[in-house]
């Protein structure tokens, strides 16, 4: 906003703003002064007194919101002074812009509120509206009181202009009359009429309020009168009633009083019962909580007993669940280790069914030989041993000796061959064991081979023992073999 413009404050005031600049709150002066005084006003606008509000007023307002012992620093006072003055200048400039757009010269309270909204102070709009209404009402009341005085003293104010004219004639200068007075004369009459109407309305309102107040005061008196009349009407009726009806009325009244008394007596009993029930419920809850705590303590003790003491010392007896988990893991590992050979055997049986069948066949033969040996009585075994020893001492015939020698040679050869085979098998087994320690399947194969070789050697040893020496007739029974590798004896 630029340029020097004239605007009028408030609805009822006749002061104006002059020399208003952008964002600056210059001091106001009347337009009745001559043009020579304009420069002086511009120079005065630069002073702090014209730019800022008086700091004394600001201090009073601030102290109202503070306790008695509180103090305000100088910096705080100055900052509040600056903020308030700038705030006023911003709002007035915004309101003047609105008036300029609407081609008006007066700044109303509504214009200030609109400026507040446009600047973003929406939270303060409603209380300002309420304050504006109250302010206008108070001004109307004050104007109504002053209106008769103004009507009486309307003639004396005309004398100062005459004196002013005489002075101006003597001085040689005659200024024109102010146009505002000419324009404001009819509105004054209108204002007086409005004030009179308002006074009448206020008087009517006051009368209505007085009437209402009187009615409110008379209401209890009227009620008492009605009650008295009603009682007076009932008394002759009661006198006319027979005694039986009076007794009935008395009984009804007594019953009502007794029921009321019983109700009043039952109320504390019910309250006591409710309190007892609540106490019992609380006791039950406490017992349940104690039982739960005891169960938890027992569980903790059991967990601590399961764990060894040195583990509890290392871990400060604060992690029982961890140790239980470790023990469970160890048990699972042991079970897995125990189940591994069975699983490996089953997998080997599935992969090598022929070897499994051979192993079963050898086991059956071994059991059959043991059964035959156990079936012989002990005295026959002793006789066999004695005869075998005697056969070595007594000189036998040539044929028998030759046969025995041939048999012995054959047996020795067989024994040597068997021993060689056994040694080879053992070496092979050792090599297999050394080479295949890491593979579980190979270990199973080696075990099966070792067992088959041991059974093979035991069968050879029994076969050789049967061919050596002279066998008594009791032991010369044929041995029928189920395996093609071992020939049957005849």
UniProtKB/Swiss-Prot annotation:
Pfam family, one: CBFD_NFYB_HMF
GO terms assigned for molecular function: DNA binding; DNA-binding transcription activator activity, RNA polymerase II-specific; DNA-binding transcription factor activity, RNA polymerase II-specific; protein heterodimerization activity; sequence-specific DNA binding
Keyword hit for tRNA processing: no
An annotated GO BP: regulation of transcription by RNA polymerase II
InterPro entries, per database record: CBFA_NFYB_domain, Histone-fold, Transc_fact_NFYB/HAP3, Transcrpt_fac_NFYB/HAP3_CS
Region feature Subunit association domain (SAD), mapped onto this chain: 80-91
Positions of the DNA-binding region: 53-59
Domain of life: Eukaryota
Subcellular compartments: Nucleus
Keywords: Activator, Coiled coil, DNA-binding, Nucleus, Transcription, Transcription regulation
Coiled coil regions in record: 188-219, 269-307
Region ranges (Disordered): 1-48, 139-195, 221-264, 325-370, 399-490
Gene Ontology CC annotation, any one: CCAAT-binding factor complex
Skewed-composition ranges (Polar residues): 478-490
Keyword check for DNA damage: no
Ranges annotated as biased composition (Low complexity): 30-43, 181-195, 399-468
Chain's role: Component of the NF-Y/HAP transcription factor complex. The NF-Y complex stimulates the transcription of various genes by recognizing and binding to a CCAAT motif in promoters.
Subunit organization: Heterotrimeric transcription factor composed of three components, nfyA, nfyB and nfyC. nfyB and nfyC must interact and dimerize for nfyA association and DNA binding.
Family: Belongs to the NFYB/HAP3 subunit family.
Protein name: Nuclear transcription factor Y subunit beta
Upper taxonomic lineage: Eukaryota, Amoebozoa, Evosea, Eumycetozoa, Dictyostelia
